[in-house]
Amino acid sequence: MNLRSLVLNEILPRVSKPAQYLGTEWNAVHKDTDAVELRVCLAFPDLYELGLGNLGLHILYAILNRLPWCWAERAYAPAPDLEAVLRARGTPLFTLESKTPLAEMDFIGFTLQSELTYTSVLNMIDRAGLPLRSNQRANAHPIIVAGGPGALNPDPMAPFIDAFVVGDGEEAICEIASCLRGLRQGTRREKLESLGGLSGVFVPALHDVAVRADGAIVSNPARKIVRRTVTDLDAAPVPESYLVPFAQLVHDRAGIEIMLGCAHGCRFCQAGMIGRPVRTRSIDTIERLMDETLRRTGYEEISLLSLSSCDYPEARTLFAQAARRAHADDAAVSAPSLRLDTFAVELADAISGVRRSGLTFAPEAATPRLRAVINKNFDDETLFTVIGEAMRRGWQHVKCYFMIGLPTETDEDVEAIAALCRE
């Protein structure tokens, strides 16, 4: 029995959510394996219900599958029940679309969304039947590439990852695919050296690292790695058709990036630092993307994504026009957490004309002292005023994000979170 038949007939009937592993979602891409030259697995080291909503994976999936000679498939971290069955049977981790073992791919691309997924990456490599360490892999093994926010500090995963994409991956992923396409018969070393010549690609094997007597780690890089940056969001590739699952997701909606980067300097915010400079997408492009997404997916909610949506230069116009477009399809518009010191309540009112979901704010700290430490410049009265106005306009649910463990934090700062919420 081949792996596909084994998975469909004997393995998936034994797990609680088999629809997550079928690979037959609406807009999933299937190609003839004999008609492509390069096979890629885009691997997300978290559960399907979290990973399918990741916009970065949607973008890379669309970019690679537009190449006629490339087929990009997907794999997600197996849930405990599936992992137990795979281990018991000695079955390797497989791609969703074709049920091919990951070890048979030309390259595997991991999205490192956060440092907490590092161990899941190692587990997926192990479940694929591949050596964990990069220097133990042979010519026949796939090249393992990683990108995303967690790749900005590659050292913790350097022993296990062959190459890191530092920065935006929309352009780099095509260059990597073209590079490996031309070296399918090449040695592993030839592939790594070729990847190491690409802008924004860090190959640990090409960099010498030593530990001095005083314990300091020093590096002798072959060349300086410059972070890749997409400068024109209107010209940047985006998915023409989002994957629409048959299983329930944590965030069951489509996302459209309206802006990258952030003009604020919150001192705890990794995304605000690594996403610079600020870049915006035009309203015309956003409306076109909304129209295509609603028409091709049937999603009932579109999220306008950015680190601070209220700082979009034409925010009022954008929110009003987005709400009107969504209303035509009986859909909702949402935005991520909003900054209290820049939030205009009328923006929320504009999108609430379709369907009020909830408002999310990010105070992060509950005392003036700790807010000053992290550069969050607002007071309690601002929070109460904004929430009160939102409730008067019909919003019924408000969520606030707070952080515990910030530098200089005291017990008083933590207790103030509960006190502020009660008030």
Predicted regions and their residues:
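N-terminal [4Fe-4S]-dependent radical SAM core
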Residues: I11-C41, Y48-E49, P204, A210-G255
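Helix-enriched interaction subdomains in cytosolic or periplasmic regions
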Residues: M1-K17, L67
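Low-complexity, highly charged intrinsically disordered N-terminal segments
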Residues: V40, F44-P45, G51-A62, R66-E73, ...
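Iron-sulfur (Fe-S) cluster-binding segments and ferredoxin-like electron-carrier domains
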Residues: C269-T285
